[in-house]
Amino acid sequence: MDDRCYPVIFPDERNFRPFTSDSLAAIEKRIAIQKEKKKSKDQTGEVPQPRPQLDLKASRKLPKLYGDIPRELIGKPLEDLDPFYRNHKTFMVLNRKRTIYRFSAKHALFIFGPFNSIRSLAIRVSVHSLFSMFIIGTVIINCVFMATGPAKNSNSNNTDIAECVFTGIYIFEALIKILARGFILDEFSFLRDPWNWLDSIVIGIAIVSYIPGITIKLLPLRTFRVFRALKAISVVSRLKVIVGALLRSVKKLVNVIILTFFCLSIFALVGQQLFMGSLNLKCISRDCKNISNPEAYDHCFEKKENSPEFKMCGIWMGNSACSIQYECKHTKINPDYNYTNFDNFGWSFLAMFRLMTQDSWEKLYQQTLRTTGLYSVFFFIVVIFLGSFYLINLTLAVVTMAYEEQNKNVAAEIEAKEKMFQEAQQLLKEEKEALVAMGIDRSSLTSLETSYFTPKKRKLFGNKKRKSFFLRESGKDQPPGSDSDEDCQKKPQLLEQTKRLSQNLSLDHFDEHGDPLQRQRALSAVSILTITMKEQEKSQEPCLPCGENLASKYLVWNCCPQWLCVKKVLRTVMTDPFTELAITICIIINTVFLAMEHHKMEASFEKMLNIGNLVFTSIFIAEMCLKIIALDPYHYFRRGWNIFDSIVALLSFADVMNCVLQKRSWPFLRSFRVLRVFKLAKSWPTLNTLIKIIGNSVGALGSLTVVLVIVIFIFSVVGMQLFGRSFNSQKSPKLCNPTGPTVSCLRHWHMGDFWHSFLVVFRILCGEWIENMWECMQEANASSSLCVIVFILITVIGKLVVLNLFIALLLNSFSNEERNGNLEGEARKTKVQLALDRFRRAFCFVRHTLEHFCHKWCRKQNLPQQKEVAGGCAAQSKDIIPLVMEMKRGSETQEELGILTSVPKTLGVRHDWTWLAPLAEEEDDVEFSGEDNAQRITQPEPEQQAYELHQENKKPTSQRVQSVEIDMFSEDEPHLTIQDPRKKSDVTSILSECSTIDLQDGFGWLPEMVPKKQPERCLPKGFGCCFPCCSVDKRKPPWVIWWNLRKTCYQIVKHSWFESFIIFVILLSSGALIFEDVHLENQPKIQELLNCTDIIFTHIFILEMVLKWVAFGFGKYFTSAWCCLDFIIVIVSVTTLINLMELKSFRTLRALRPLRALSQFEGMKVVVNALIGAIPAILNVLLVCLIFWLVFCILGVYFFSGKFGKCINGTDSVINYTIITNKSQCESGNFSWINQKVNFDNVGNAYLALLQVATFKGWMDIIYAAVDSTEKEQQPEFESNSLGYIYFVVFIIFGSFFTLNLFIGVIIDNFNQQQKKLGGQDIFMTEEQKKYYNAMKKLGSKKPQKPIPRPLNKCQGLVFDIVTSQIFDIIIISLIILNMISMMAESYNQPKAMKSILDHLNWVFVVIFTLECLIKIFALRQYYFTNGWNLFDCVVVLLSIVSTMISTLENQEHIPFPPTLFRIVRLARIGRILRLVRAARGIRTLLFALMMSLPSLFNIGLLLFLIMFIYAILGMNWFSKVNPESGIDDIFNFKTFASSMLCLFQISTSAGWDSLLSPMLRSKESCNSSSENCHLPGIATSYFVSYIIISFLIVVNMYIAVILENFNTATEESEDPLGEDDFDIFYEVWEKFDPEATQFIKYSALSDFADALPEPLRVAKPNKYQFLVMDLPMVSEDRLHCMDILFAFTARVLGGSDGLDSMKAMMEEKFMEANPLKKLYEPIVTTTKRKEEERGAAIIQKAFRKYMMKVTKGDQGDQNDLENGPHSPLQTLCNGDLSSFGVAKGKVHCD
């Protein structure tokens, strides 16, 4: 039998054969035979070997098709069932759970053979399930010991004894495995499994730490013990899959990491050169001189108000930097314990990494701007937008793409399983028929087919349309490709076995004379298969059959007919949509009641809320009881929502009973009330979707969550073990010096115990790592470098990889639920929607009745105006003519009328309507009486038929007359209006600027008949009916003048100059707003000028509006959204001109004036349109987030309201709770009791607090206040309420991670949907054709360039050869890297010797690069300046020379610009390294994605700037007089436009918005109402919250969406077989073979040229026969054109595809247009024909030589015979018969 075929498998015990010495001998024999076959020459064409079977993979469970394992063979060596291992020295072992283990049959450790008793015992132990459970239990207990054991006592005896025990267990486990498997040499040995490497390292380190007399520190070594937690991953195979996916994503991240590191290095160098030594500028007292020890001279430094921090200053600020008695000087102190600075490359790099991760970057931003000047903001803009937004989101893009690739594999796998399912179904059907024919009982198979292979059960294999990384199959979560134990029981594996079994049980096996035993085994096989299928089916059922019977017996109440009647009535009522609507209204009102709770409620109000709670609880309990009665408990509890409702109702009932009986409420029970809010999800699809996403993600992300928990656990324990002793809750004296009872030296964030260490790691995952790292470094002393390593590792591994995969999965979950929700929404509506539909239908009925009455009245009013002519003729006039006429009419008549004769038959109109078209229509739809106006004349009956449009298959209705009116005076296209006398409301304006509605596509020809560019009607159609005075005839005086005026206005407003002028005025008026800052009051002349310009601008806008009214008409003007926006802004501008006190507040709204730019600038218009398309979805998600957050708000109010107060003294320090315990003591002791500005006193405040927590800004103060809170109006105590941490952790996971990422999901999803609507140009091409098309598109734009000619001068030629060589480039790039390293070595206050060395090095580099420039100019001559890179190099060299000269000047004060700018010039040299990018394909893809994104990002940037501009103007109007406090100071404020923009740029990333809001949230008590400093907290909150939502959540997420989209596009392009660079390199090689750029090379040079090309275009030698296949066309002189060669080589790389010839012809035509040179040369032969000619010539030559040899040897007579004989070689050739020589027949001339 062929080795590749599967053996016949019958499910009985004979499958399991013990592994004996005979088995080993048989394997050795097979291996020897295989080796012989390999040596044999006959077997060189190797037969493909079988692959390992997935269902028999190690660690999977053995499929039940193989039968039960004999008890005596459990744990014993068996012959391998997988044919793949037939020729491998291996055996398999099965345990009781049928798990497969494989071992090598060679000697373990060179001693123990496969039959050794010690090894057999080790094998039995290692495969036993109890052994695995014991090891997992040990790992868990060990983790608990590590987590609970405090770091302070890590060397205690108890801990050491426990560690010895655990180490002993791990050593025992390793020894057992080594004895069973061998160590490393053989297959399946111990160290061949990478997971065992981890065990070895942990054990090795543990042993080393116990060696006596060892001198190294034990603590870092023992910290490695924590990695034992990873053993859980090695035991649970599902976790291995997730870790594998993570590792794959890390592989893909390599390019991003390299690019990020490179960019960070560049930014760090620029920052170092710009800001070196600037952050140590402080205000020092003029009395203090020579401060050597800053700590001793603390009094010499000026401090910030109410802060212990030193005041920073900048020399650029002059005298205003410090107070009068202080001056600005350099010191030895940098901010944040000296860790924030740019003094050397290391600290600068750390600062840039902090900027990129956006952790407290606003502090660095404020410090740098204060010390170096406001121009530094441009540096931060570049780093934030390029470094932070782009590079960080590239990480997300790469992880998302890696995940989507996995998705595609999953989809393919599911599709394959589905196909296999169908095949198995068919095979089993055939098998059943075959077995029945042989007399096997049909009943054994009937159940299999009927119970299992049904369409319903097919769903168990997963829905292939649903692409999810984790398959949600029947409520069970299973990752694809999983190696888990449960996976092998899934049906796909069964089906694989089924298929194989069916093949083995084919009819051939069961002939009449077959073995009866074989027939019995076949029956056994099918029966076991049936049983297995049934077991699988039962495993999917919700409960056992006995449970189902009991439930149907006792939980379905059908007592008596009367009871059934009651049930029927109740079911009708309870399932009615109105009942559901009533319950939903109750839920909403109940939610409002819950949200109304607040601090300091009045007794009556509280009583009302309690009564309300009782009422709603009663309603919900009654609903539950009635539904249970109506539906029976059996059916009621089968729905998830009903179970949820019943739980909430019963908990509420328990809470009420507890209050009634015990007169007090339990917080635990009361908090469950808020779950009622989630009942809204039943009737609100979006909320339902969100809950589904969270549910699916929590389930589907189970494995990932476990991995994340393990990672957090490991880092928490590592932090606790390494830093727990020093970095604990008590601050060290150098950080805190308690001078009194008000100063606390306790810290909330530390690593002193596991819980707090976990919180620190969680905080790092939230994005805040730098502050804890500073404190850790300060406390750890010698281990400070370890702090940096650990904290950055947590940031990179945790935040950038794991959380990004989490987000990627969540986004995919969102898009899937969104699509599924849309499909379900189309299919069925919720009951609330059905109830609302009833109301809508009732309202529509009332409205239509009223409209009908109005139209009836209108028609009565208009009837006298219509005159009828006797004779029963139809209406006919010179103004109204029939649209459809008989074909028999002459063409002249038709031309006169100007109407086409034919109308498409597709018009969907009733046959009894008459369609009329007026030639010239009035400005409204009223028809005028009189001879000259429209008259209705009745046509004779026969002719009337010609005017009617007939439509088949329509039932005739009552006679109606309709007319189609074409507005001949519309602006662009005609208005086609159907007038139905019965239904005037159906008048439809078909074509307008705002909307286009095609009436049955048949009127596509109408616009061609209509004059263009004319105004539309002034008033809406139908207006003249109600107001006859507005009816005008524009053909009669004086309305002709009005019509001409309108046409003139129309031409004006449509003129490009008018639009340009308006844009100019908008820009000027917006610019004027900039000057209205806080200093305007002191500048009356500027104020007067601004008032004048404001009046002028307002009048210009009014004039523009009036012109547009006249030109467009009111109908068109007010139906355009952009025009409405302009109108609102003009009205606001007009109100500002009126000097009324009441209207003064409207002046602020002038800030909206720049919005007019939106309608004028196309780039922003595109972005806004995309944004408007997403607004409904964004608002929906925003509303869902608000509801979701409401639950946490209500809980927050319940837990923390009134508890955020504290007692402070005169210096704003909190007094210790042991001195003052409550508010009354505080006030009696003449202290101040203040409440924190952001608190949980009511739901509104709670929303603000949660927004700060969700954006991680200002959240520390809120968490501190919460965890320190005791009771209402009690003094806070340090961490008295530690459970408060849990509240915030849960909110961050569900309220921040889930809900805020939904914004990204919504925007990306909408963005993709709009892309699909706009795209689709490639939908008619196959994938192969797309590839070919892309390649052709790239090469079509290329053509050969003429290379730079080598100089004739020998010296110049030598230099030319040097500078054009690759080695020269490598040397120069190496020097650039060395120059970069030398710049990195610079530092602030470096030793003079070091400074001298670096200066000299700089001179050396300047000289080298100058020489390089001169040498290249000498060698390349004028061609040097034709290359962009050369020009860049030249400019850099010139600037370097200038900067180096200026830096040598002693007196640099007179230079008009800062000398630091010249330092930056040197950095431009680094830009030359970008040449290397060409070699790095992955990085090139990333940069290409950036280049593709730039246009879109520029538009988004413009929109963001516009939003910032408007908010800056609003901020200047509202907050210009806020006193300096918290984040508001002399630089960052809203006093001027520049300072406002600085603040808004900062908070566009949500950074520090809490500190800017804080000064504006003054309480009424601390605010003087007469002061201008008082502001409404509501306005300030709305201002900042709206800006955060618009900029941070929407615009910045659009930025992310663009990057993701373009990264995907760039990746697709980079994955194309041929890229731009391949074509560039082709032409570079071409230049060497075609120096004159003729576009042709000789055929003889083709072989060398093809071999010289790099892959994939290269055709390696020998390649002549491959050219034959290509059939290349040649022109005269045996030349080939470059395009022909490139086409042929491209087709060879891409392979064959349909339609390539037509595409090639199209691309060649384009190339011809671009390169007319090829037209001059027509091909005369091809390479194939030329080769045939060459072979023919060679044969002739050979024959001729043969003939000549015979001539010389033979005599003359023989020679005559040869010449004249009929079969002479020469004669044969002359006859043209070359077939005997292997050449195609052709004519050979012998003349």
Swiss-Prot record:
The keyword Nucleotidyltransferase does not apply. Its main location: membrane. Coiled coil: none annotated. Expressed in the dorsal root ganglia and trigeminal ganglia, olfactory bulb, hippocampus, cerebellar cortex, spinal cord, spleen, small intestine and placenta. Residues 1-126, 181-192, 240-255, 403-572, 632-639, 688-702, 812-1051, 1115-1120, 1162-1180, 1309-1361, 1421-1426, 1485-1499, 1605-1791 are cytoplasmic. II repeats lie at residues 559-833. Keywords: Cell membrane, Disease variant, Disulfide bond, Glycoprotein, Ion channel, Ion transport, Membrane, Neurodegeneration, Neuropathy, Phosphoprotein, Repeat, Sodium, Sodium channel, Sodium transport, Transmembrane, Transmembrane helix, Transport, Voltage-gated channel. Residues 345-369, 754-774, 1244-1265, 1537-1559 dip into the membrane without crossing it. It is a multi-pass membrane protein. Residues 149-156, 213-219, 270-344, 370-376, 597-607, 660-667, 726-753, 775-785, 1075-1088, 1139, 1203-1243, 1266-1281, 1386-1396, 1451-1461, 1523-1536, 1560-1579 are extracellular. III repeats lie at residues 1044-1339. GO terms for biological process: action potential initiation; acute inflammatory response; artery development; axonogenesis; behavioral response to acetic acid induced pain; behavioral response to formalin induced pain; calcitonin gene-related peptide receptor signaling pathway; calcium ion transmembrane transport. The chain crosses the membrane at residues 127-148, 157-180, 193-212, 220-239, 256-269, 377-402, 573-596, 608-631, 640-659, 668-687, 703-725, 786-811, 1052-1074, 1089-1114, 1121-1138, 1140-1161, 1181-1202, 1282-1308, 1362-1385, 1397-1420, 1427-1450, 1462-1484, 1500-1522, 1580-1604. I repeats lie at residues 115-408. One of its GO terms (cellular component) is axon. GO terms for molecular function: voltage-gated sodium channel activity. The keyword Acyltransferase does not apply. Disulfide bonds join 283-322, 776-787. Pfam families: Ion_trans (PF00520), IQ_SCN5A_C (PF24609), Na_trans_assoc (PF06512). IV repeats lie at residues 1348-1639. It catalyses: Na(+)(in) = Na(+)(out). It is found in: Cell membrane. The sequence contains 4 internal repeats, each with 5 hydrophobic segments (S1, S2, S3, S5, S6) and one positively charged segment (S4). Segments S4 are probably the voltage-sensors and are characterized by a series of positively charged amino acids at every third position. This is Sodium channel protein type 11 subunit alpha. It comes from Homo sapiens (Human).
